[in-house]
Amino acid sequence: MNDLLLENLFGEKALCAQVTRDQLLEIIAAGARSKFPKSLLSMYRVTPRVMTRYPLKLITNESITGVVITTVYNLKKNLNIPQNNKLTTQDIERYYLDKSVEVINLMVGNTSLGDLACGRPRRTKSSKKKDPVIFLGISAPLILVMNSKKSINTYIQDKKSDPSSDYVNINPGIGVLENYGNTYLLDIHNPSSVLTISTIYGLDNNMELKKLSTASEIDAYQDVNIGKSVDLKKFNEIFNTMKKHLSLSNFSI
């Protein structure tokens, strides 16, 4: 049981805490109370935004592909599924694509976890400090590939314009490429209406993507683990491979 507790990756400390007072107030006003599912991004204290003070500028109308990354343990925990029970595809869809979910963050081609962690250069005294651990060796990571059911409008906040005095809700069924930390995530609003989980992957012991196509493959994957921890540097390598292999959407800004 103690080993299982170690897999709760989304602990009390954020990997990047450089938030100004104004940014904190904006986060609270724009989405801190919204209903959204947890993922790997929770360890970075990412709170999706459901409101904005800026006009939205259209950047594209096309089908999109992004990923959500989590672990078997954390999905079971968030769904209140006993650890000795099996997680199903239906459970995953229920958690991420329920009609009550207001917004979901997708990692796309514009995303870099190194930048999300502030990308601060290390000082000489801390040069031997290890990178933060993204996955523990006892983890069973899940990479959920999400595709839009059709072409959707994707916007970016036009921060060259003067902000309005009031926050306004962002319309459902659209994507907004949002800046978090020093990188970008694609926020999909009311994802149940526009997204589908097209493919589920795990990671094998060689840190390569392992496609989980059937219910039996998903069941069997939950009985194993990756065997060794994955730090931020290694995860960035894995994620860069994902970008190419999974053809994640990449937006010109």
Swiss-Prot record:
Site entry: Cleavage: 31-32
Keyword Magnesium attached: no
Molecular-function GO terms, alphabetical: structural molecule activity
Localisation per UniProt entry: Virion
Alphabetically ordered keywords of this record: Late protein, Virion
GO cellular component: viral capsid
Propeptide segment residues: 1-31
Coiled-coil regions, chain positions: none
Modifications the protein undergoes after translation, according to the UniProt entry: Undergoes morphogenesis-associated proteolysis which cleaves the 28 kDa to a 25-kDa product. Proteolytic cleavage of major core proteins P4a (A10L), P4b (A3L), and VP8 (L4R), which occurs at a late stage of core formation, is required for production of infectious mature virions (MV).
UniProt cross-references to Pfam families, sorted A to Z: Pox_VP8_L4R (PF04498)
Induction: Expressed in the late phase of the viral replicative cycle.
Keyword Ligase found: no
InterPro entries listed in its UniProt record: VP8_pox_nuc-bd
Family label: Belongs to the chordopoxvirinae VP8 family.
Function: Major core structural protein.
Protein name as it appears in the record: Core protein VP8
Annotated organism of origin: Fowlpox virus (strain NVSL)
